[in-house]
Structure formats: C-alpha cells, structure tokens
Amino acid sequence: MFGEAGKTKFQIDLRQHLRDQNISDNLVHLICEIAEASKYVINAIRTGDLGVAGTSNLYGEEQLALDVLSDRIIRKRLQHSGVVCNIASEEMEEIFQVTSNPQGMFSVAYDPLDGSSLVDVNLAVGTIVGIYQGSDLLQPGRHMVGAMYILYGPRVSMVYSVGKGVYEFTMNQLMEFTLSREQIQMHPSGDIYSPGGLRKKYCEGNERFIRYLEAKGSKLRYSGGFVPDINQVLIKGKGVFMYPALTDSPNGKLRLLFELNPMAFLIEQAGGAATNGHMPILDIVPESLDQRCPIYLGCRDDVVKAAEFLNTPCKTPHEEPQP
C-alpha cells in the first residue's frame, strides 16, 4: 500500500519540483541547464574517445579527451544560460568571465568529469557543481545557494540541494530526470568507510581512526571515484568518506572549490558533517582556485570521532582505540 521510504509515489520532473521549492526562476533555469548538459556528457562517456587530449590542467595532470569534451559541454551550457557571470572549472587555469552577461546573478564552480580515469575500466564517474550568488567564487562554501552532483553509473542520477534538503533524481529512458528520493537523511553513525590515499602515509591520528572503524566492524567500501563513493555514503545514509593529509601531501588531494564544498553542502543538508579535521569544510575561506584540503565527511558522529583522533595525542605507542 505504501511506497518505499524516501521514494516518491508519482513521477515528478525536475523543473516542476524546483518550482515547488520557492526559489528564483533564474536558479531553477540554471539547475535545469546543468541537468540538460549531463545528457550530452553521458552520451560522450558512452560513445566518445577514451584517449588523452595531449594537454594538461592547472595541476599538471594529463587531460583525457573526455575531460576536455565534458568541460566544453558544461561551460557552453553555463555560458549561454543568461544567468551566469563567472565560471571556474577544474580543467581551466583561470576563471572564465561570461562577457556576454557580466551582470549575471550566479557564479559556478564545477568538476566536469570527476574520476575520468575510471571510464576505460567502466567504473562510475560524475560531475560536481557548486553555485554561488554574485561574482565571487573565493568565498566559504556555506555561502553557496545550491550544490549538486550527477553520477554516471548503471543509472544516471542527480543529487542536489538548494538549502532545503537533499533530493535525488534519476534519468529515465526518455532522458528526463524524475524524482526518486526526497529529503535524504543520514544516520548519526554508520558501518561503512571509504578511505582514500596510501595507508602507510597516514598520520598517527588518522591511522588510529581507521583502527577504531575496523574495531567497531565497519566495512571498507572504496571505488576510487569520489562521486560514487560519496553517493554510497549519502544514499545509504550510514558511512564516512575520507581523504586525509598524507606524510608527503599535508593538504590532501581533493580540491576545496570544485569537489569538497559542493559535497560538504549536500552532506550537511542531509544531517551529516564535513571537516578537514580541525574546522567545518564549509567555513574555510578559499585562498586560490586550486586549493586542496583534507576531508572527512559523512555521518556526524563518525566525523566528530575522526576529529577527536586527529586532535588528541596517542597516550601509549600501541594503544588501540575502542569503538
């Protein structure tokens, strides 16, 4: 008689749902434009060139042809939306100013195809987007007016928030996004963990946190793709993702502006937490487009516990933390 918890009984399309959220027509239009771009990105993933592009991004990483194409698809959509003034992409060296619309209401930071190196082995990848009011992109993530990711897996799904809860939409056979989960919420604590980075390079506090998770029976679930790993933690509502500081990379690997802020926004909206181990991710003031940051995000109690281990010296060399 009753549908599955968190599912919607009747099909609701994305534009209709956004209008029901009582947000501005311009923000509705922008989110729908990004969703529309994803249809072309998934087509490129399924049919496009998997080779290298012969170029590098601002981090010195070799760009794949799919990176470049996905970036172009999304940037063109944003550029012609009529509501965006500044665009920052992980694949671009500097902010792209929309000269045709310098008075645009929003600025957008995005990773066009996170995990693109996984495409050739047919693993899930995704697009990550953060939306800010006005022209300033170097502001704390807490100032975002919207965040979303699109997961290109066995199904294409979009998870978004405009500060009024977290919703999931799934692409149907007509390539339309329809509501599939409403008001996604995380449990206080979970039983899965997704740890990035080489374990032998973890600091002492992070190693103790891992042993704590193992002792309480948490299961390791890590694909190497940021979007699918966060999606698992968020949709299951019971886990923690981390990419910590490493001995040779004290600032971690993931980018604050393009990856961490949007995901932290979504996780907090679902009742979870996100920290660099010392302060909430969303309170960090970015100093540059390419700023990196350690990250712990997921169930609130687990994230708090991670910070405790990181900020509490070990009492004895061989002390095993208790769950």
Curated annotation (Swiss-Prot):
Binds 2 magnesium ions per subunit. Substrate binds at D114, G115, S116, S117, Y222, K253. Mg(2+) 2 binds at D111, D114, E259. This is Fructose-1,6-bisphosphatase class 1. Its EC number is 3.1.3.11. It catalyses: beta-D-fructose 1,6-bisphosphate + H2O = beta-D-fructose 6-phosphate + phosphate. It is an enzyme of class 3 (hydrolase). The gene is fbp. HAMAP family: FBPase_class1. Its cofactor is Mg(2+).
